[in-house]
């Protein structure tokens, strides 16, 4: 049963995030450099600032093929003082939307010389052994205090949501 609050969406989102920070939980923003994840990041920065819990943990999976402007934007975000940015490189196959003859693209393929990659990750990027997206936000990578939970904040538009 839905229970409507007497709040707008912005205020409700900030209050919910702030309550997570105040309770000592770990909050990690899943970031792509797109509009949805940027909104989530900005909401978390506001909430973490109010709760005095900066910097905000941010994780991004480098997919190698990015528009140059998106790559540059992600680099700027990574340098923000209110952000603790985890730029991860998971050498894994992803769906190749650019070539119908080859359904998968191997991200920063370790079998190739680095010079053959579409672009190089930044020097501070961390290569991870895991080959699946579920490994990006784990208790091992983002440890919490005893009894606390790690929450992943992911931007997803209502039209794209299964529920």
Predicted segments, located by residue:
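ATP-dependent adenylation/nucleotidyltransferase module used to activate substrates
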Residues: 1-163
């Amino acid at each position: 049963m839905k229970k409507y609050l007497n709040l707008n969406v912005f205020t409700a989102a900030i209050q919910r995030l702030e309550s997570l920070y105040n309770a000592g939980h770990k909050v990690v923003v899943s970031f792509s450099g797109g509009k949805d994840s940027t909104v989530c990041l900005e909401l978390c920065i506001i909430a973490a600032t109010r709760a005095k819990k900066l910097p905000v943990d941010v994780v991004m999976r480098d997919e190698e093929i990015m528009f140059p402007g998106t790559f540059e934007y992600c680099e700027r975000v990574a340098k923000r003082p209110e952000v603790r940015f985890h730029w991860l490189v998971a050498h894994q196959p992803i769906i190749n939307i650019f070539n119908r003859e080859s359904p998968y693209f191997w991200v920063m393929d370790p079998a190739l010389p680095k010079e053959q990659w579409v672009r190089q990750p930044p020097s501070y990027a961390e290569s991870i052994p895991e080959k699946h997206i579920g490994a990006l936000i784990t208790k091992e990578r983002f440890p919490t205090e005893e009894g606390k939970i790690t929450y992943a904040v992911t931007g997803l538009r209502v039209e794209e949501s299964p529920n």
